[in-house]
């Protein structure tokens, strides 16, 4: 597997300070400054501190940074770095998939991307890129690329192979791609280890491409590979990439959710939202703990854990929202499911729990607010637009980002109130990251910092 590493200007300073990176990162994380994985600390999608309410294409933008490719993965923030993944070039796709465009049209592609897209052998041109930018200024710090290698899965036109959001434990960054390739990088961008799950285990054949992101637990990187044929849950050693445990999950369990690790009353639990049911495992060993739920088609939302309950939406069409207490064993349907709300569930965006209320939006911009204690609907409000990004909350506000670049800022509470509608003329599928009072939005081709 070929690899490329391109340090940007200023990376020498980063390398010289590598010995103290862990301490600096820990200090920032303790102050609530990091957003180290999909949906931030604890995957809760909640930020602390004061956050901006209004911005536009010309106001409130701290910086913009062009990306080295396209993708729908969300940014993460580790110390003074904002890290994001992208795809350069086009991948051959299996029958039944749809080829995503690199951006809205060829005019928006850089000369390099256009040349790659026109290459006679697109598989040779395909690159997966991990980039780091200075959190305060947007200056590029480093870029690492690896060659994309098949087998290549089916894809939906809304995304490409750079869909999983990277994760970090404060020492390394783990970037996963839709072929099954995963790379671990130091915070200086230097490669530590790589694996290709699509060739080592089985080709990735999740319907519409792979969307699940890595979850970090202690010294493990946990990966959900729910596919139409061989589905499995895998834990790799964070330092070496070696397999620590693997659980086969059968066939036909297609899902795109990201596993969530929580502290339950009887020990830590690893939660998985899949088409067959909801499962909890011991994250240290992969042992099954409990399960519940009936079959649903292709769940995408990830679970959230707040106030002693697990909340999640089950996915495609006429689905429901559940509140589950952890700590059970075996089938917990009759013992630990506190409530089920039959409508208002989101298909793609995940739920955010904020100050006792659940907020969710469907793909057509209808926001539903539910009482987290009872499951009773508090209100519904139509924003309009198309939504794939998951909402985030903080500073008494809830943020919803539409595909067409509108961010609706709602006042958190029992009455719907839109505080602002902020427009950026770009396409957004990725969910926001928040750190140090800044909101980071990733479009098709740009990383934007709002402050």
Language-model-detected regions and their locations in the chain:
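Hydrophobic alpha-helical segments, especially transmembrane helices
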Residues: 13-14, 40
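General helical structural elements
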Residues: 7, 16-17, 43, 446
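Bacterial N-terminal signal peptides
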Residues: 15-26
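N-terminal secretory signal peptides that target proteins for export/translocation
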Residues: 1-12
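Short intrinsically disordered, low-complexity coil segments enriched in acidic
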Residues: 2-3, 17, 84, 188
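Noncatalytic, solvent-exposed loop/strand surfaces
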Residues: 28-451
């Amino acid at each position: 597997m070929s690899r490329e590493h391109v340090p940007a200007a200023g990376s020498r300073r980063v390398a010289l300070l590598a010995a103290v990176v862990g301490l600096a990162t820990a200090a920032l994380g303790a102050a609530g400054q990091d957003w180290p994985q999909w949906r931030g600390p604890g995957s809760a999608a909640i930020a602390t501190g004061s956050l901006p309410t209004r911005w536009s294409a010309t106001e409130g933008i701290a910086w913009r940074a062009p990306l080295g490719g396209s993708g729908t993965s969300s940014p993460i923030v580790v110390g003074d770095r904002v890290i994001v993944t992208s795809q350069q070039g086009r991948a051959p796709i299996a029958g039944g998939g749809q080829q995503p465009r690199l951006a809205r049209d060829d005019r928006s592609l850089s000369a390099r991307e256009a040349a790659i897209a026109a290459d006679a052998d697109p598989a040779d041109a395909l690159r997966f890129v991990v980039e780091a930018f200075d959190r305060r200024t947007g200056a590029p710090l480093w870029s690492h690329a690896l060659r994309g290698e098949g087998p290549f899965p089916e894809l939906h036109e809304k995304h490409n192979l750079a869909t999983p959001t990277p994760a970090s434990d404060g020492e390394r960054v783990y970037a996963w791609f839709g072929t099954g390739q995963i790379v671990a990088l130091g915070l200086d961008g230097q490669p530590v280890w790589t694996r290709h799950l699509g060739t080592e285990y089985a080709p990735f054949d999740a319907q519409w491409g792979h969307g699940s992101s890595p979850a970090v637990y202690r010294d493990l990187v946990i990966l959900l590979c729910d596919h139409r044929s061989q589905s499995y849950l895998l834990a790799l050693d964070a330092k070496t990439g070696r397999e620590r445990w693997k659980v086969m999950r059968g066939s036909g369990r297609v899902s795109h959710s990201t596993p969530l690790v929580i502290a339950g009353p009887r020990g830590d639990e690893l939660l998985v939202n899949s088409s067959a049911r909801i499962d909890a495992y011991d994250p240290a060993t992969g042992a099954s703990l409990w399960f519940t739920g009936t079959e649903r088609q292709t769940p995408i939302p990830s679970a959230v854990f707040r106030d002693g309950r697990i909340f999640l939406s089950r996915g495609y069409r006429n689905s429901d929202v559940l509140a589950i207490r952890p700590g059970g064993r075996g089938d917990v349907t009759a013992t630990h499911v506190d409530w089920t709300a039959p409508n208002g569930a989101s298909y793609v965006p995940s739920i955010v729990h904020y100050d006792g209320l659940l907020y969710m939006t469907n793909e057509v911009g209808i926001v539903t607010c539910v009482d987290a204690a009872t499951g009773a609907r508090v209100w519904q409000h139509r924003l309009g637009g198309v939504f794939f990004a998951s909402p985030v909350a903080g500073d008494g506000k809830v943020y919803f980002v539409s595909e067409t670049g509108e961010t609706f800022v709602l006042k958190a509470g029992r009455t719907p109130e839109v505080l602002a509608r902020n427009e950026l003329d770009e396409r957004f599928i990725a969910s926001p990251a928040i750190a140090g009072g800044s909101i980071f939005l990733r479009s098709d081709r740009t990383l934007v910092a709002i402050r």
